[in-house]
Amino acid sequence: MRVVLLGPPGAGKGTQAVLLSEKLGVPHISTGDLFRANISQQTPLGREAQKYMDAGDLVPSDVTNRMVEARVNEPDAANGFVLDGYPRTVDQADALEKILGDMNSKLDAVLCFVVPEDTVVERMLARGRNDDTEDVIRNRMRVYREETEPLLDHYDGLVVTVDGVGEVDEVNERALRALGR
């Protein structure tokens, strides 16, 4: 099963991705993990990403797309994956469709975790990270609404919304039900 997870920052996508990956028997693919792995292994893509990150810039989509393409073509992803943190934009979604099309494959589902903004702010402030101030969190929410929410229309027909409020296991049960599991 090939699944993309969407939702605002702090919606619990990373937590749910790990659980879904275990229950579906497919790898959890996170762009953050891909960046770290490529950088620590000093791959050509890792070195390219590092240059941007060192300058405080976002890693360009073409670099991210190539990392994702390499990862979804690894043997452990032959039967599917849970993608977390990608795609973030419609351009990245188009790139993913091409990558999967080249593999004679396509997405099975897009889960969108729905969490009210005030709940997101509370959750992220409770994590106690230095860079998680309320202003920063609300700005990340704005960026999500502007750049990532348009994916909901792009993936019309594949999107299943999941109530992301509640205990981790409750949300996971809802996510599995949404996938028909």
From Swiss-Prot:
GO molecular function: adenylate kinase activity; ATP binding
Catalytic activity, as annotated: AMP + ATP = 2 ADP
Pathway the protein acts in: Purine metabolism; AMP biosynthesis via salvage pathway; AMP from ADP: step 1/1
Residues involved in ATP binding: G10, A11, G12, K13, G14, T15, R127, G166
Keyword Kinase among record annotations: yes
Cellular component, GO, one term: cytoplasm
One biological process term in Gene Ontology: AMP salvage
Transferase listed as a keyword: yes
EC number: 2.7.4.3
Subunit field text: Monomer.
Family: Belongs to the adenylate kinase family.
Domain comment in the entry: Consists of three domains, a large central CORE domain and two small peripheral domains, NMPbind and LID, which undergo movements during catalysis. The LID domain closes over the site of phosphoryl transfer upon ATP binding. Assembling and dissambling the active center during each catalytic cycle provides an effective means to prevent ATP hydrolysis.
Function: Catalyzes the reversible transfer of the terminal phosphate group between ATP and AMP. Plays an important role in cellular energy homeostasis and in adenine nucleotide metabolism.
Annotated protein name in UniProt: Adenylate kinase
